[in-house]
Amino acid sequence: MSEKEIWDKVLEIAQERISNTSYQTFIKDTQLYSLKNDEAIILVSLPFNASWLNQRYSEIMQAIIYDVIGYEVKPHFISEDELASYNNVNTQEVQEPQVQHSSIDDKTWGKEQFNMHNTFDTFVIGPGNRFPHAASLAVAEAPAEAYNPLFIYGGVGLGKTHLMHAIGHHVLSNKPNAKVIYTSSEKFTNEFIKSIRDNETEAFREKYRKIDVLLIDDIQFIQNKEQTQEEFFHTFNELHQNNKQIVISSDRPPKEIAKLEDRLRSRFEWGLIVDITPPDYETRMAILQKKIEEENLDIPPEALNYIANQIQSNIRELEGALTRLLAYSKLQGKPITTELTAEALKDIIQSPKSKKITIQDIQKIVGQYYSVRIEDFSAKKRTKSIAYPRQIAMYLSRELTDFSLPKIGEEFGGRDHTTVIHAHEKIANDIKSDPTFKQEVENLEKEIRNQ
């Protein structure tokens, strides 16, 4: 594939895995500048965007690029302003020939895995995360002696990954020779599949079972993957039996992960389970203030107050709003005021009268309209009287919410994201070809928005 084809595919996958607001604001217009020497240089329009993407989206973009090209590279976002200095630094470097990368990279035990900004010192503590922070610090201070496994769950962008990186940094600061691996369940699955294909399963097992600390993110994505669950079960057992620390994160507690083997579920519950909840107003303000101090920015308190009052869901969106404001101010050439802040964020802030639409809201309205029970949206029934309303509900979930395709599939009985894509395409085509049906869907959309 050419670099353009690679990046087109990366963007396609990113649109599925990243919230629509973040994708449209920060990812959509990025360009792949170069792909060499195990590094992907990605061009963005503004330095603010580059800094924020490097801090917050490096891991997920690294996983997506891996899925597309089949070997690991580290993404690095740079702005157009930084491009000249980057080229100057690299003009004298000799380009190394491409080599075939093994699916097993056993040199990923050090601090290079972790975002340098994600430490315990930069983690802002509040009522919603105090207990997870304390548990993570205890684990980092004494791996396998405090809580093993440590299971952290909570919504997107609340700080689970930050805590996992902080644990990694802390362990390696205390024990530089410790073997620590941070991965996601998706990356674990992809490496496992590739190891089977390349006849490297023993090397794969050596990598993941002969370590001191395993940090695995988004474990919920191993649901429905029987072979991966089998492999992870044995990996978990060997690490635990050898008194090695395991830290797991998820968007839900073990008991709510559908199609997870009971033997894995019970092991996840052996140690300590902690949940992170959305930050309160004081914590949101503290996060914004810490951010502007780190970046040495001058933003009026009333603008920060506006952001903290309007963005309440998670930290990632909070910091994203700040980055968007800075970019907007620079592009408009205007000083930051409350009025400019409201103008900059109008597309991502709901009006006071509006309510964030959930998939359950959509299922309820569509179910009432077509006389389908809520539970039937998640059932395996394929009769047309149920299957077609289910496709309509999937279509509306994609159109009216920021949930990723896998998340939408989960809410419809753990269906694969390709099923959601198919449903969206089918309903979109039916809308184009049938004016009566188009009006029907528009009426449903109005009812959902107005409930």
From Swiss-Prot:
Annotated source species: Staphylococcus epidermidis (strain ATCC 35984 / DSM 28319 / BCRC 17069 / CCUG 31568 / BM 3577 / RP62A)
Which family does the record assign?
Belongs to the DnaA family.
Q: What is known of its domains?
A: Domain I is involved in oligomerization and binding regulators, domain II is flexibile and of varying length in different bacteria, domain III forms the AAA+ region, while domain IV binds dsDNA.
The record's subunit annotation is:
Oligomerizes as a right-handed, spiral filament on DNA at oriC.
Upper taxonomic classification of the species? Bacteria, Bacillati, Bacillota, Bacilli, Bacillales
Q: What is this protein called?
A: Chromosomal replication initiator protein DnaA
Q: Which NCBIfam families match?
A: DnaA
Q: Which gene encodes it?
A: dnaA
| InterPro entries tied to this protein | AAA+_ATPase, Chromosome_initiator_DnaA, Chromosome_initiator_DnaA-like, Chromosome_initiator_DnaA_CS, DnaA_C, DnaA_dom, DnaA_N_dom, DnaA_N_sf
Q: Where is this region: Domain IV, binds dsDNA?
A: 330-451
Location of the region described as Domain III, AAA+ region in the Swiss-Prot/TrEMBL record: 113-329
A single GO cellular-component term from the record reads: plasma membrane
Residue ranges for the region (Domain I, interacts with DnaA modulators) are: 1-71
Q: Which residues bind ATP?
A: G157, G159, K160, T161
What is a biological process (GO) this protein takes part in?
DNA replication initiation
Record's keyword terms, sorted: ATP-binding, Cytoplasm, DNA replication, DNA-binding, Lipid-binding, Nucleotide-binding
Localization per Swiss-Prot or TrEMBL: Cytoplasm
> Where does the record place the region Domain II?
71-112
Q: Which GO terms describe its molecular function?
A: ATP binding; ATP hydrolysis activity; DNA replication origin binding; lipid binding
